[in-house]
Amino acid sequence: KPQTTRHKIVGIDSREKSQAVFVDTPGMHKKEVRAINKMMNKAASSALRDVNLVLFVLDADKWTQNDELVLEKLKNAEMPVILVINKIDTLENKNHALPLIQERAKLMNFAEIVPVSALRGANLDHLRNTIEKYLPFQPPLYSLEQITDRSERFLASEVIREKIMRQLGEELPYDLTVQIESFKTEEATINEKTGRPKPACTYIDATIFVYRSGQKAIVIGEKGAKLKKIGMDARVDMEKMFEQKIMLTLWVKVKGGWSDDERALKSLGYSDI
């Protein structure tokens, strides 16, 4: 969904002969009204100073004011910019793909233009090969097994937030955040009474903060149905991610004004760097 990334997140793609480190930034916000918007803009802008290559990702089916804002920033970039046109498979007429690419090519002097479908995995290998051409020759920055620089607590909060977005659609685009209150792992042991192995298990307690009580009711749903579904889906994904049993407990609390309070933002794990 658009405008859902709030943190600068590093993803690591290690291949046989290369390692690409992706910095997924929050989108730019034209109206810097709330503190969270200002922090997100700073995070996006600061990333441009530290990278060797920029991927400018656009949807094939639309052009937004925020796209225009990012484009103006990129025109002054000192590094190559690759235009990635996503959702190319959504075009009703496939003959419109080439004219679209030609039209987008006029936006600025792109180093490359690569159409893809992230959902279907179409042309992603070509994109990876294209990126590889622009990587500097140097030793890997991360171990080959590492896929991100973020903690397990952060990844857990992002999984929960993603499931909330999927359940609620556009009802709560910015007015919620997730805080991991407790993250404890019990290693695998042997049950003293039965002698049977007890698998490792991670116990996660998380709070979903919303602005208003009406939003709390939306997240919980009738008889708790939505919150239960969010928890179940998040637990399934976490068990795949962490490769162990997960016990997840969710609460929903009202915390008005959190997105315009810098102290509250920092206490919830937000940063402008």
Where are these regions (language model features)?
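Catalytic P-loop NTPase motifs of RecA-like helicase/translocase cores
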Residues: 5, 29-30, 63-64, 91-92, ...
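Flexible beta-alpha connector loops of hexameric P-loop NTPases
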Residues: 28-37, 89
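Conserved, well-folded catalytic cores of nucleic-acid-processing
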Residues: 12-16, 28, 47-54, 61, ...
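Residue-level signature of catalytic and energy-coupling elements of molecular machines
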Residues: 9, 24, 44, 55, ...
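Short beta-strand-centered segment that lines the nucleotide-binding/catalytic pocket of NTP-utilizing
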Residues: 1-13, 23-26, 243
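Conserved C-terminal guanine-recognition region of P-loop GTPase G domains, centered on the G4
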Residues: 13-20, 38-113, 184-199
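P-loop NTP-binding site
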Residues: 152-273
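Canonical P-loop GTPase G-domain recognition
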Residues: 79-82, 89-154
